[in-house]
């Protein structure tokens, strides 16, 4: 007997088409079951089909979804989850057009967050991050990548990674940990970036042994780390058994996209300034282009990543919030979906695939997250919407009704609007 059976699902977005990364037309295709049903047993999906096909199934609880839509839990593959403080005091500077790198040079930007994170205890960081994770869950997210990077020293980086490990045990959202020690060059290492990178590399063997990080990331940008420094750093991390990511071409077209494809990074993120050659190389690789349009929007920039061109050229595109205290302080992945549709010229179908299937592959979770398929974890979202286009169309609010994580209700908005029923 099933534990739970969801019936009368108006649109069941299984996202279950071809295995692997979605490109071109596959990104613009959504497998939808009309009048669908999903069965759950011991936290795992055991039935996917129509209500007609579900007749005869028995369950301890049958939930009538009332014609509303159900999707997989969403995947946010790029966040800076664990940090201290906030940076609302920088809004005025940004409105005046002060460049981020100039704010950074004055001790603001990431350096402000670094100081706040250093001063916070691990428990304070955990409690703050739980608040943000609860919000992410309320927007339908069930899997999140979480970066360190607000320490720029060994003690604080360890503290962030240990906080993430504790959150993995204490919060229902699945977390994927990334070490971003190479997020900026500390003042004391100004002009000695290679020495700083070696210090960060020296931390990796113990980090691997303690399983505190799965990925290693670096901020490849003018005034931070060069393309060659980034490639060398990430290749050494790969030799130690880590998968790698890269903050690439966010501000200047340095060739970060090309570097990511060349070294086989799991993802290249931002890519606002990615060159035509970089896009071509990404299209011919298994590196996911994780686009972060919320950051461009919040920084009030005119030029967004060329998402339309990337998809047309065959790049596997994912979307993420880039949740962080400085350049994108939002947990709302649904807002990111809307911005991507309007500013990156992505279709609703492409947007949905970019926050489920491709985003799961960007963090090596393509075989366990992002699809509704028999045998996978029952990470499901019931939406207060009757078709998938409505969610990115009606922007600025959350359309989530209920979230199931591993078959258990992890979030519901007020009183549940669905009703129990028999089949």
UniProtKB/Swiss-Prot annotation:
InterPro entries with a match to the protein in the record: Amidohydro-rel, HutI, Metal-dep_hydrolase_composite, Metal_Hydrolase
Q: Which residues bind Fe(3+)?
A: 78, 80, 247, 322
Top enzyme class of this protein?
A: hydrolase
Q: Which cysteines are joined by disulfide bonds?
A: none
- What Gene Ontology cellular component terms go with this record? cytoplasm
| Entry-linked HAMAP family | HutI
Protein's UniProt name: Imidazolonepropionase
**Organism annotation:** Bacillus cereus (strain ZK / E33L)
């Amino acid at each position: 007997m099933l534990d739970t059976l969801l019936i009368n699902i108006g649109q069941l977005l299984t996202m279950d088409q071809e295995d692997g990364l979605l490109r071109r037309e596959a990104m613009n295709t959504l497998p939808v079951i009309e009048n669908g049903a999903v069965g759950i047993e011991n936290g795992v999906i055991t039935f996917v089909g129509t209500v007609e096909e579900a007749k005869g199934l028995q369950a301890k609880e049958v939930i009538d979804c009332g014609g509303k839509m159900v999707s997989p839990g969403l995947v946010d593959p790029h966040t800076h989850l664990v940090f201290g403080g906030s940076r609302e005091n920088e809004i005025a500077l940004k409105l005046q057009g002060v460049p981020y790198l100039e704010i950074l040079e004055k001790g603001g930007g990431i350096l402000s967050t670094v100081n706040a994170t250093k001063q916070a205890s691990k428990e304070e960081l955990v409690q703050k991050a739980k608040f943000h994770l609860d919000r992410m869950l309320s927007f339908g997210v069930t899997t999140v990548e979480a970066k360190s990077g607000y320490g720029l020293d060994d003690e604080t980086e360890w503290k962030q990674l240990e906080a993430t490990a504790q959150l993995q045990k204490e919060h229902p959202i699945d977390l994927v940990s990334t070490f971003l020690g190479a997020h900026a060059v500390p003042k004391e290492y100004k002009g000695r970036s290679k020495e700083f990178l070696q210090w960060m590399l020296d931390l990796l063997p113990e980090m691997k042994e303690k399983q505190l990080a799965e990925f290693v990331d670096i901020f490849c940008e003018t005034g931070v780390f060069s393309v060659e420094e980034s490639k060398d750093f990430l290749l050494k991390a790969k030799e130690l058994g880590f998968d790698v990511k890269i903050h690439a071409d966010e501000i200047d077209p340095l060739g970060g996209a090309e570097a990511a494809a060349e070294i086989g990074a799991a993802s290249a993120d931002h890519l606002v300034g990615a060159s035509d050659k970089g896009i071509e190389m990404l299209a011919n690789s298994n590196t996911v282009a994780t686009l972060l349009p919320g950051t461009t929007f919040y920084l009030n920039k005119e030029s967004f990543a060329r998402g339309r061109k990337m998809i047309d050229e065959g790049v596997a595109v994912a979307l993420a919030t880039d949740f962080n205290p400085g350049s994108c302080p939002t947990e709302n992945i649904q807002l990111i979906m809307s911005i991507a549709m309007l500013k990156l010229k992505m279709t609703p179908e492409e947007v949905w695939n970019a926050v489920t299937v491709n985003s799961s592959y960007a963090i090596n979770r393509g075989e366990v997250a992002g699809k509704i398929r028999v045998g996978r974890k029952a990470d499901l979202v019931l939406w207060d919407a009757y078709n998938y286009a409505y969610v990115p169309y009606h922007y600025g609010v959350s359309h989530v009704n209920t979230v199931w994580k591993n078959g258990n209700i992890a979030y519901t908005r007020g009183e549940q609007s669905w009703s129990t029923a028999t089949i």
